[in-house]
A protein has these predicted regions:
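A short linear hydrophobic-aromatic micro-motif
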Residues: 60-62, 86, 125-129
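N-terminal beta-strand motif that seeds the catalytic metal site of vicinal oxygen chelate
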Residues: 2-46, 100-103
């Protein structure tokens, strides 16, 4: 399909309508107010940083050297937050489903963090820290 063309039939398909009609459970014990940040693993740190800075306009806010984290870590922002995206290098080759290092969500209180943690455990989500 040519770039800039919208697939109207695809958007109106039963599968897409089902996704659009999906609602948030009313009994969630927390309320996510924002995606805080996303940390991605990359095979080519220089190329990845160049994409986020030169193409998307992000600004580098911090760099953790190899001595702090294998492969280095580069933090970047596009708003007033310290970082919205961070990259972790040191991956030899792309691995299916291993590019996402972690992501963070913001909630309104520490109590909600603890409730979210328990909720995620009940749903068999592995929490590493």
């Amino acid at each position: 399909m040519p770039r800039g063309v919208i697939d109207i039939e695809g958007i109106q398909s039963p599968e897409m309508q089902a996704l659009k009609n999906k609602t948030t459970p009313e009994d969630l014990p927390f309320n996510i107010t924002k995606i805080g940040h996303v940390v991605l693993r990359c095979t080519d740190m220089e190329r990845s940083v160049k994409f986020y800075t030169d193409v998307l306009g992000f600004r580098v806010t911090d760099v953790y050297p190899e001595t702090m984290i294998p492969g280095r870590m580069v933090f970047m922002r596009c708003n007033n937050d310290h970082h919205g995206v961070a990259l972790v290098g040191g991956i030899d080759k792309p691995s299916p489903n291993e590019e996402l290092h972690h992501m963070a969500f913001e909630v309104d209180s520490l109590d909600e963090v603890l409730r979210a943690r328990e909720h995620l455990k009940k749903h068999d989500v592995t929490i590493l820290f």
